[in-house]
């Protein structure tokens, strides 16, 4: 662009401004006042004079300086216009000042062509929106000016972007309001103009900073891309030599494997063994020094890679990334998260003791580490075995769940566990209630909250406040009130006259525990809850006054003592008597599932004589059982539930029998190897693992020859699986139990949603839960029998499949896998 073209453009701008000012003068009645128009015209004249001077001086400059001069003059124009506006604002009335600012805004809007479209109607302003400048500026970037306006736009905008007059326009455009409203606003707050000016200044500064930040991000992205191009694909997997303390010998690894039940369990044990620092609070109590954000532990990729390398030795299927992500990785994350969630719960307690989160039979870490680290490992073991009074062992929780027929009973078990001081010889419990109702003292809210947390985990319905108060809090209060009925000297025999039916509450307590006698039973260290002790030496056992099926049914004093001392509660004592007096029902055939006490629900009735004998022994040690209502409400349900429930002892025995001890290469030392999957594949290629441990050898029939017969019972068509689908699930499964659990996800898609409805279900409907659809459960067993035909299918189903199904219902959501995606397709 030469000087002649620039002069012509400026003259066109001057003409357009003059026309608009004259039109506005004719319609002065529509605006504010003549004075405002006069001052507006003066301000326009000053701007025109500045432009004319600029154009005249422009002609004297050589062509080589065309890019710099307009920028200089424009920078000089902006402060001049601002100073003129400030003077007019100070020397005129609010209304006049507003008119001047509005006029100046319109005139400057015409001075800078290309930043707004021409307006045909001179009486109507071309813009009336607040923050017009911001939105219009965005449109300018998207739609660059065209035609004759482009040249002037390049002169005043592109020459020096940092000095754009848009800031002046932004300062003046908020003034474009009607005179009356603006005048009133100015009277109320004379500093509004300066506030708006400061606001837009801050916005411009923020925009500039964000632009710089985006530029730096772009540079970093380019640098990362450049580095990625230099790294060859073969070098993407890092080969690292772990430090000596993270290396295990073959014998040490085999010792851990022998204690593991699955690949995920082995991974968790290796996590504890190799990285004990992840489970300590040393140097981890501080948060971020800059922002104060609390630090959070997590498993790093090197941790996981080292664990995976060891797991692959005994579980080759883990070499498949999909198997690792579906079976081991979720269990690792769940184990690690549960540990720290429990640790946070302990830290919230007043006592600073550390709980034993791991199993009591855990192998001493000193055997696995080098001699130089034995002292450190032993100190870690000592610190990890300090029992906390506020943490319940996993074994205890399992037994509580087996015994509890309702959330209230489960809460009562936890009450005895966490508040042992209320149930000793002092009988302090009758002075307390959950929340201090009835003028009694309030239970420790922190320990009570722990009870509620445990109850909500296993009984999700208790998350509702009303359900908790009605079923659990009321049950706890009844238990505490019932201590007054049981008060009496320990030496005196219990009296029968204090147990009449009129004195019994609606919900009868069957738990009578004592925590102070734990030292007398060294063989049961994991037990924390006991029945009230009874001196069997002084106890006289009368003969029953009814006919007994045989003399072998009668129990001696020593037999009663043994059963009583191994029981968790008086209800558990009755269940153990059932097992002892009905041995024919507790075999591998599981005939007990066909029986109950009353013969209802299509089942057979248990022998009434032996049931009567059970009651005879129970009421001998627990006189409340003489009341028919107590016996029916509390004990009959326990006996029926024991008939439904699987035999825990039999299952443990079955697992012990099928546990495979893989012959490990003791002569080879893993420390001589770099932790490399390829080296492991070469050195540890041995005989195939048993079906329970390998997905490849899990199915008894070759997959190519697998043909699943059609079920001989009616099944809805959406739940029927093709042979191809069954083969895919078999390939993804690690054991027959895992296969059943995957079929559960496949056939019950409605339970595996965000609502977690599966937490309310289990296989049998025990523990106050709903029963899964029997038809689909029967279909799961049909598929299991098809791919895993064995002689003792009943054992496999009860000790492998049912526990896996129940565990899958209890387990929280984990990372989605292919089987879950297919389940969603079926739901659609």
UniProtKB/Swiss-Prot annotation:
Keywords: Chromatin regulator, DNA-binding, Isopeptide bond, Nucleus, Phosphoprotein, Repeat, Repressor, Transcription, Transcription regulation, Ubl conjugation. It comes from Homo sapiens. Changing residue 57 to A: Loss of nuclear localization. A motif (Nuclear localization signal) lies at residues 56-58. PANTHER family: BEN DOMAIN-CONTAINING PROTEIN 3 (PTHR28665:SF1). The keyword Transcription regulation applies. This is BEN domain-containing protein 3. Pfam families: BEN.
């Amino acid at each position: 662009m030469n000087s002649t073209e620039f002069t012509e453009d400026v003259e066109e701008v001057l003409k357009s401004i003059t026309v608009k000012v004259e039109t506005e003068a004719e319609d002065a009645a529509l605006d504010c006042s003549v004075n405002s128009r006069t001052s507006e015209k003066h301000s326009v004249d000053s701007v025109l004079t500045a432009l004319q001077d600029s154009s005249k001086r422009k002609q004297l400059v050589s062509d080589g300086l065309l890019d710099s001069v307009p920028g200089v003059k424009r920078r000089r124009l902006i402060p001049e216009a601002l100073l003129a506006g400030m003077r007019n604002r100070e020397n005129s009335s609010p209304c006049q000042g507003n008119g001047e600012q509005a006029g100046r805004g319109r005139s400057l809007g015409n001075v800078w062509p290309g930043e707004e479209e021409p307006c045909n109607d001179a009486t109507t302003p071309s813009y009336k929106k607040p923050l017009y400048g911001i939105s219009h500026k965005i449109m300018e970037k998207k739609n660059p000016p065209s035609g004759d306006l482009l040249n002037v736009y390049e002169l005043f905008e592109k020459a020096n972007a940092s000095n754009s007059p848009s800031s002046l326009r932004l300062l003046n455009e908020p003034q474009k309001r009607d005179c009356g409203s603006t005048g009133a606003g100015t009277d109320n707050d004379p500093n509004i103009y300066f506030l708006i000016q400061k606001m837009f200044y801050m916005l411009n500064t923020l925009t500039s900073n964000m632009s710089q930040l985006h530029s730096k991000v772009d540079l970093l992205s380019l640098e990362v891309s450049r580095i990625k191009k230099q790294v060859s694909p073969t070098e993407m997997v890092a080969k690292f030599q772990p430090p000596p303390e993270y290396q295990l010998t073959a014998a040490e690894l085999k010792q851990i494997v022998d204690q593991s039940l699955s690949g995920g369990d082995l991974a968790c044990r290796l996590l504890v063994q190799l990285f004990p620092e992840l489970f300590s609070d040393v140097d981890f109590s501080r948060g971020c020094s800059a922002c104060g954000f609390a630090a959070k532990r997590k498993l790093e990729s090197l941790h996981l890679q080292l664990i995976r390398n060891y797991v692959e030795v005994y579980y080759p299927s883990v070499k498949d990334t999909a198997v690792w992500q579906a079976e081991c990785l979720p269990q690792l994350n769940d184990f690690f998260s549960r540990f720290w969630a429990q640790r946070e719960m302990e830290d919230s307690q007043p006592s600073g003791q550390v709980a034993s989160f791991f199993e009591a039979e855990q192998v001493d870490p000193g055997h696995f580490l080098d001699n130089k680290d034995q002292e450190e490992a032993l100190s870690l073991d000592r610190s990890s075995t300090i029992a906390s009074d506020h943490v319940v062992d996993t074994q205890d929780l399992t037994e509580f769940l087996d015994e509890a027929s309702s959330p209230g009973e489960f809460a009562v078990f936890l009450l005895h566990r966490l508040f042992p001081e209320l149930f000793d010889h002092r009988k302090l419990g009758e002075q307390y209630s959950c929340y201090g109702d009835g003028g009694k003292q309030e239970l420790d809210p922190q320990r009570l909250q722990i009870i509620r947390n445990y109850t909500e985990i296993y009984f999700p319905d208790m998350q509702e406040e009303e359900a908790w108060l009605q079923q659990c809090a009321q049950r706890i209060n009844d238990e505490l009130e019932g201590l007054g009925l049981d008060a009496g000297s320990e030496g005196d025999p219990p009296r029968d006259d204090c147990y009449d039916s009129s004195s019994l509450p609606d919900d009868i307590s069957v738990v009578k525990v004592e925590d102070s006698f734990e030292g007398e039973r060294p063989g049961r260290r994991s037990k924390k809850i006991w029945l009230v002790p009874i001196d069997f030496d002084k106890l006289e056992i009368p003969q029953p006054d009814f006919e007994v099926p045989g003399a072998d049914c009668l129990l001696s004093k020593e037999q009663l003592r043994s059963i009583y001392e191994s029981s968790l509660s008086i209800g558990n004592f009755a269940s153990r008597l059932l097992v002892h007096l009905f041995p024919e029902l507790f075999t591998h055939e599981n005939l007990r599932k066909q029986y109950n006490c009353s013969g209802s629900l299509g089942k057979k009735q248990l022998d009434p004589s032996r049931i009567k004998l059970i009651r005879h022994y129970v009421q001998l040690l627990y006189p409340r059982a003489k009341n028919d209502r107590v016996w029916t409400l509390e004990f009959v349900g326990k006996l029926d539930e024991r008939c439904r429930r699987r035999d825990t002892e039999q299952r443990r025995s079955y697992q012990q029998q099928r546990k495979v001890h893989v012959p490990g290469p003791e002569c080879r030392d893993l420390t001589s190897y770099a932790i490399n999957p390829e080296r492991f594949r070469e050195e540890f290629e041995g005989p195939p693992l048993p079906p329970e441990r390998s997905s490849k050898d899990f199915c008894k029939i070759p997959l190519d020859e697998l043909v699943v017969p059609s079920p001989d019972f009616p099944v809805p068509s959406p739940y029927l699986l093709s042979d191809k689908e069954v083969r895919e699930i078999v390939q993804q499964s690690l054991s027959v139990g895992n296969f059943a659990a995957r079929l559960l996800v496949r056939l019950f898609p409605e339970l595996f949603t965000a609502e977690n409805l599966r937490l309310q279900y289990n296989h049998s409907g025990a523990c106050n839960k709903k029963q899964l659809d029997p038809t689909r459960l029967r279909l799961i067993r049909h598929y299991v029998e098809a791919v895993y035909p064995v002689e003792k299918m009943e054992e496999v189903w009860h000790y492998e499949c049912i526990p896996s199904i129940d565990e899958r219902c209890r387990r929280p959501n984990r990372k989605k896998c292919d089987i879950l995606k297919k389940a969603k397709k079926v739901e659609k």
